[in-house]
A protein has these predicted regions:
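Short, hydrophobic alpha-helical segments
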Residues: 112, 116, 217-233
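Phosphate-binding P-loop
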Residues: 2-7
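Short, well-ordered secondary-structure micro-motifs
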Residues: 50-53, 104, 140
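N-terminal phosphate/diphosphate-binding loop that engages ATP/GTP or pyrophosphate donors
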Residues: 26-98
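Short, hydrophobic/glycine-enriched beta-strand segments
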Residues: 9-14, 38-41
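Conserved catalytic-core segment of NTP-binding enzymes
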Residues: 127, 132-224
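Glycine-rich phosphate-binding P-loop
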Residues: 11-28
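Phosphate-binding/switch loop-helix module in NTP-utilizing enzymes
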Residues: 93-136
Length: 233
């Protein structure tokens, strides 16, 4: 039986592809270099077709519904390699068939249980950062950050389903006025079925891609994530 993991878990999701979820994780790893991060990317695929880009690729396990690999080379340019290059202590890639994520959870749990906590005290929960929306079906992480771009009309069902669980919203385009309500109205106008009521009361941070991490987001995570007791997973 996989061991129970005691960890602070930060999940980064987003409403569509190519809006900088991986880039945000890279920025967060760099912002907290002493966190001894275990980082991971979770990919679901269908019939040999990659969920990222829609083309056939080698991310689909050939014989099994799930596969998990630890990244060992920070220079390959893959997303999991980028996590290592940014300073993560360990980096993994979990792949499952579409709709079969539950079958991959024992592998994920066992991998996190085996990962060391680096220089963290033995009784301190390890710090884990994962890229996924669907993982929220199976856990309530310490923090869930949702990456949004109101000018991108595509909206994943998994992102829509869990938007009300977001602890904070990261916008990839700067609103025309410095006001949280402007961002909320943009979302409501751009995406059918997304109401501003889902976003009410949630912190909003603006970080266009390739710009520095907002300092107020760093403060938010230092207070909300690193002071949290962690969860059992």
């Amino acid at each position: 039986m996989p061991r129970t993991v005691h960890a602070r878990i930060l999940v980064v999701g987003g409403h569509t592809r190519n809006i900088g979820k991986t880039a945000l994780i890279v920025d967060l790893i760099r912002a907290f270099p002493d966190a001894a991060w275990t980082a991971g990317k979770i990919t679901q695929f269908g019939h040999g077709v990659c969920s990222r880009g829609g083309a056939a690729c080698d991310c689909a396990p050939d014989e099994h519904t799930v596969a998990l690999d630890w990244e060992s080379d920070a220079s390959t340019g893959t997303d999991s390699a980028r996590f290592l290059e940014a300073g993560a202590e360990r980096s993994l890639w979990l792949r499952t068939k579409q709709g079969r994520l539950a079958e991959g959870l024992p592998l994920l749990r066992e991998a996190l249980a085996k990962a060391s906590g680096g220089a963290l005290p033995p009784d301190c929960p390890r710090n884990v950062i994962l890229e996924s929306n669907s993982l929220l079906q199976f856990m309530r992480p310490s923090i869930y950050l949702a990456v949004l771009d109101p000018q991108e009309s595509d909206f994943k069902d998994s992102a829509r389903l869990f938007l009300d669980r977001a602890d904070a919203l990261i916008f990839r385009r700067r609103p025309p006025a410095r006001a949280e309500e402007t961002a909320k109205r943009s979302v409501e106008a751009s995406w059918l079925g997304v109401s501003s009521a889902l976003l009410a009361g949630r912190p909003v941070f603006v970080q266009p891609e390739n710009e520095p991490l907002p300092q107020d987001l760093v403060v938010f995570l230092r207070e909300r994530f690193f002071n949290s007791p962690g969860i059992l997973f």
